[in-house]
Each structure stands twice: as structure tokens, then as C-alpha cells.
């Protein structure tokens, strides 16, 4: 055998081994992430996040059973791209199907309540992208519809589902770090001023608070003992009137404080700092974080905590809904956090006299 052919054979063997290892990793991920019985999933909406979800599921061996979109051509293209089993002629047809158990709702914020009503009344479990609704009243309505129809409603905000946060919250609640005193978070993205896109268009429920602030407030609420009752804030509007930059200060009955800085028109690190008596916890890129650094107060030593995988963020979201359907009480309780966060966001926008067209 020539040297070249021998190398080719070795390369082929190595490639085959890599494929086998990847398959084993995917199977292991499925076993680790999905512990409850699988549901048959339909996706409503075919935007960026829906495509990310489809890719995340494919990477761990799961598929989507159906898709529907207001534009049929987009649904067909989505199905072809992600090997979706069936394209429905309309969203109503998908919701009427007895071949779909649960839906992942990815349409713009201001349409969520429309499809939540339809899906929940159709007896479908719903995983709804953030921001789950526009305001507290809508979320309470959706919660009641879920209760009446015996189905689960869940917020897809990744903070609620990442294994890292479940681990850190458990350690905080066990008192390992002492009382949490202060939480500081930054979240900044630079978005060009396109007044027709979802970031700045009030007709698409644009603005920093509902788009990125929901992450910051959700993280903060996870580590607070109770809902903040003192709320101070300032907001700078974009030319369209939606909030472009927000500064938020919160305090609860226990004296725990939260300081948040949010902007859609300046880049800054997505950084969270949770400060307690015995240590502080730093988390970078926190919306889908899998790593945190703990610095101990007494000796300055650092501990790296790594739990889960950022790449599996959306798979964790879907797995939690399936766990809730199977009776997991902790997964079912996540909506309480979402309700507190929505209450805060509604209060903040009321303070700013900032209502969306649907609310006026």
C-alpha cells in the first residue's frame, strides 16, 4: 500500500471514529437533558429563535413534528431546512391537530397573548418565547387559561432553564455564601436605528426592557428572597418612543438590592455579579451561561463552577416543559418567577408612561 493510500485509510478511520463519538455524545446528551416522556412538538413562527431551537434539538437527536407560520412559504422552507414532519396550512390547523401535544411560540411579543389564548384553549401545552406577554394582566389571563384546560404554560427565558443557575440557586438557598446583599447586571447590545425592526418598533413591542431586560430581571429574581417593593428607574427613549436605555434600582423587604444597566444602542459586557457575605459570584454572557466564578471573601480564592452547556440552552428549555407536563414541581413553579418579572416590567413601563398600541 502506498503512503498516500495508507494515510487516506487512517484519515477515514479517524473520521468514522469522530462520527461515532459525536453520535455517542448526542445520545448521552439526550439521556441527560430529556428525562421525561417526549411530547410531539409544533412550532409557531419561523424566525431566528425558531431556527436556533430546531438546530439545538437536532444536535441532541430530537425533531419537530409540525410547523405553522403566517406566511406559508416560510413554514415550508423551515420544514425543509430542519426536516420537520409536517407543515400545517395555518396556525389554527396546527392547534387543532391531535398529532401535536405542545407548541413552541416564537412570534413577536405583542402577538403572544393572541396565540396563547388559542393554544391553551385547544388543550396544548405551551412554551412561549420571552417576553412571555406584554404585561401582567395578559400573563395572569394565560395562567388561568392553562389551569382551566389542564395544560402547562412555561416561559422560554433561558435564565430559568440553564443548569448553572439551578446549581447556584441551590447553593445560595443552602446558605453556603451567606445572605445575598447586592446584584449588579449589565446588558448592552448595539443595534442600528432601524425604526421598522423589532428592537425599536412599538408596533412589534420593541424596546430594551422586554427584549433584554427580561433576562436581567429574571436572573435577579432567582437570587432574591422576595419580590422587590422599592423600584426606581430612568429611561431614555429611542426616536420611536420605546425604551432604548434603562437604569433600574430595586430593593426588597430583606434589604437586598439590584442595580441594572440596559441598552440597545451601546455594546457592553453581559455581566452579572451576585454579592453575598462570604463570596461574590461573577457570570459572563449570562443569558445562556454555563460557567460562573466564585471569589471567596476571606482568602480571595476562586472557584470555577461549570454546569451544563451553552450550546444546549434551548434544549434545556424544551426539556423543562416536558418535565413540567410529567409532574416535576420545580419545573411547574418556574411560572411564579415569570409572573414576578412581568409585574416588575409592567410597573416600570407604567412609571415611564410607556404603553404599547395594544395597551392604549
Task: Outline where the language-model segments fall.
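Glycine-rich "substrate-gating" loop/helix at the edge of Rossmann-like oxidoreductase active sites
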Residues: 203-210, 235-239
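Contiguous beta-strand/loop segments that form the cofactor/metal-binding neighborhood of enzyme cores
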Residues: 2-3, 218-289, 319-329, 359
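C-terminal helix-rich "cap/oligomerization" subdomain common to oxidoreductases
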Residues: 1-11, 18-35, 102-104, 253, ...
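Hydrophobic residues in well-ordered beta-strands that form the structural core
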Residues: 88, 128, 153-155, 283
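N-terminal Rossmann-like dinucleotide-binding module
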Residues: 2-82, 358
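Oxidoreductase and adenylate-handling cofactor-binding alpha/beta cores
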Residues: 161-184, 210-235, 249-256
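A contiguous active-site-proximal alpha/beta segment in oxidoreductase catalytic domains
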Residues: 133-192
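Beta-loop-alpha module in the N-terminal Rossmann-like domain of NAD(P)-dependent dehydrogenases
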Residues: 53, 85-145
